[in-house]
Amino acid sequence: MENALTARDRVGVQDFVLLENYTSEAAFIENLRKRFKENLIYTYIGSVLVSVNPYKDLEIYSKQHMERYRGVSFYEVSPHIYAIADNSYRSLRTERKDQCILISGESGSGKTEASKKILQYYAVTCPASDQVETVKDRLLQSNPVLEAFGNAKTLRNDNSSRFGKYMDVQFDYKGAPVGGHILNYLLEKSRVVHQNHGERNFHIFYQLLEGGEEELLRRLGLDKNAQNYQYLVKGQCARVSSINDKSDWKTVRRALSIINFNEEDIEELLSIVASVLHLGNVQFASDDHSHAQVTTENQIKYIARLLAVDATAFRESLIHKKIIAKGEELNSPLNLEQAAYARDAFAKAIYGRTFSWLVRNINKSLAYKGSDIQSIGNASVIGLLDIYGFEVFQHNSFEQFCINYCNEKLQQLFIELTLKSEQEEYESEGIAWEPVQYFNNKIICDLVEEKYKGIISILDEECLRPGEATDMTFLEKLEDTVKNHPHFVTHKFGDQKLRKSLGRDEFRPLHYAGEVNYSVVGFLDKNNDLLFRNLKEVMCDSGNPIVHQCFDRTELTDKKRPETVATQFKNSLSKLMEILMSKEPSYVRCIKPNDAKQAARFDEVLIRHQVKYLGLIENVRVRRAGFAYRRKYEIFLHRYKSLCPETWPNWDGRAQDGVAVLVKSLGYKPEEYKMGRTKIFIRFPKTLFATEDALEERKQGIATFLQARWKGYVQRRNFLHMKHSAINIQSWWRGNIGRKKAAKKRWAVDVVRRFVKGFIYRNNPRCPENEYFLDYIRYSFLMNLRRNMPKSVLDKSWPVPPPSLQEASELLREMCMNNMVWAYCKRISPEMKQQLEQKVVASEIFKDKKDNYPQSVPRLFINTRLGNEEINTKILQNMENQALTYAVPVVKYDRKGYKPRRRQLLLTHNTAYIVEEAKLKQRIDYANLTGISVSSLSDNLFVLHVKCEDNKQKGDVVLQSDHVIETLTKIAITAEKIHNINIIQGSIKFIVGNGKEGIIDFTPGSELLVAKAKNGHLSVVAPRLNSR
């Protein structure tokens, strides 16, 4: 906590005890304001936590924050609700004494949220097991259920607790939460039937209508519109922007399941809730005798079905009153006003009893399941008191009177225990106690609860006396009995000024929190809390198990008059005070910053009023009764030892002696401090502040010194580490190199030995002596083969294999060739395939037979040498639509005279055509083509031999083509005459016609020459090429 003192000017001090002007209310408020502005909502008064409701979500409740406070000393961290929770838990574990945390403050100050945060802290930080996790879940989930049935929106608070709650959380010897128990106090049942303007009924009604499933609402006879129910419209505030009833409904349903309510229990519980809504819609009318009669029969049927009672009996119980006089039973009819009273009384009774049943069943779910007596005996508890805050409304009635009486008792307990704990600490430390003046509210508690003369006793007496007792007769008796009390006044005994602010039906006690006007209207009815006997009888016969448990039949036979509500509440408070007095208390005082429920708004007038009536200034004065600050010697010495040369850096003696030396060095004056048995007490905050400022200055020098030492240490550590690492690396590397060399030598010797032996036995069958050598030879050959593989099918190179691998080498060679061929074939296109097929045919026919064949090999064969535009369309039409496969320009030599003429040779699938421009000169069917002759020289002439029996034919045809190899290959393939091509050396004879024969003489020469010789032959001179 001392760490925050350096920022005290901006964010205030974390402990009000450290305020210099601690008696100043303005200084107190200003410190609250500074912290509230910085979202620091928690501040200490010694061990008391003051909490200001921020009215917004703050990022200070995560698991990381919980871990920060877990197991840490109370003053080592900033103020927080978790610090209070952890301090109580650690005290429970170490001292084995039951603890309690008292949360107080006015309505809307955040008490309920504080209790939930404490439960969440225990759920997260305490030891866990499967059983413990179940208990944790049930403890946490009991909150939304109780809030739904016991909380409501008021003018001051959208989630105001309308009942008091004290919860014991039980822990086993390991510190794990293993059970719990809840006590509830004074549920505000009147809210069921009436709400002030701007307020709502209990949350559960709106949650059921807004979030309930259609089928559920149908079974309960409800619809979603809250405006249709009389008990929900009186406050004219059914919807609230800050409340999500639909989402809350899902939370409540899930919570009911977690705390062990089955579906039947939930259905029966909701049936009662729905019956209350229907009950509010029951209407009456007067008959001729002014007796009340029910006019809404449907509502009666719904209620009877939901509560599982007889409809007729229930209707009669609402409009008649059973009176037992001298052993005789009489049914007295009710008028309209009485019937409405009976209806509302029953609604309040059944809701109040159902709430009590709900708490009892939650307690069964939370009950400690210790398996043996020892386990039960070792269980300790931490109590959480979340009870209604002090309330002052425009109209204050019986409920506000009871609530404020409860707050008076808690304030009295707080003062007593605070003073007591302070006095005990001073006495245990051997320091004289200085009495503190404070307002003792015992006089107000006595005004309310004193026997015979207290307000409760007078109210009970008026309720029980025979005759016509009314609220006004109660007020008159109150005035007669306590009119002289200094803290009590009524309109009758007030002065002129006071009477203007006090009604004739009101009385005003002076509470510790201020004056409150209470209207006595309804005091007697609410205190009696009467329910007509015949309504009880009908409910005792209910088939709804919950209703049956809520209305015990012994009530009908018990002759003893039940205690009044006020007396029950007083007795419950007395028992609660005993419980709290038996435990070690911790306090959380909650403050509401404004009435508008707005974030970041600080209403100084409202806060000053709360600070005053909560007695916070008195609390600071008690804590500062002589000394503002106290710490154990060990903690004080550890923090401030650097300020004294004799205690820095370490003190070897007792901590108390070290502190004595330290404060002497700091120059503390005797009146500024006292030395206790285990603690040092500092009287003035300025003394502590001066010490803290000196420490902050000293920290700078220490930080510089530590930085220098640390940097030197780090550099030396790094150097030594590097040196050590270098030596290790050198050592390892040398060893590694040496080991590698030795291993290599051993390996080399072994290899040489095996290699030599293998060489000697290399020609023997495989055996241990030669297997290494043979493997090496095989490996070497394969590696050499891998590097020298043929690159194409034309590459015939192949490494020479060793004798032992001859057969394997041939197989590999064949596989390699097949693979290359397969890969090559896979890559070629259909066009290239056709080209190769033609080239293969050309090779078969002309290779090594005709001189100009080699020049044709690298040249691609063209599909046609003439385009369609070069061939006359009439010719194409005369071809009888035969598909043209090849066309080439040629030179035709006449049979007589051998005159050359330009022609076109056109090939189809069945016929060859010789064409002269637009005239078809000759048609040669392939069937009549007997052969083809060509010379072996480099000329381009060839002869097509045709059968002469066909009159259409004119004899053989002599042609010349510049692409003779391509042309003849195409003819051979198309006409299927591959084996009919004759390559002739010397002369070629051919038929001219009419049985005559022509001769072509081929002779080698220097250049190509075609001419008619003198002997009548066609002479062809062709150069001889060396390529063949």
From Swiss-Prot:
The modification N-acetylmethionine is found at residue 1. One of its GO terms (biological process) is endocytosis. The keyword Cytoplasm applies. This is Unconventional myosin-Ic-A. Residues 12-696 form the Myosin motor domain. Residues 573-595 are annotated as: Actin-binding. Transmembrane segments: none annotated. The keyword Metal-binding does not apply. Residues 850-1024 form the TH1 domain. It is found in: Cytoplasm; Cell membrane; Cell projection, Stereocilium membrane. One of its GO terms (cellular component) is plasma membrane. Pfam families: IQ (PF00612), Myosin_head (PF00063), Myosin_TH1 (PF06017). It comes from the Eukaryota. It comes from Xenopus laevis (African clawed frog). CDD domains: MYSc_Myo1. Myosins are actin-based motor molecules with ATPase activity. Unconventional myosins serve in intracellular movements. Their highly divergent tails are presumed to bind to membranous compartments, which would be moved relative to actin filaments. Involved in egg activation by coupling dynamic actin to membrane.
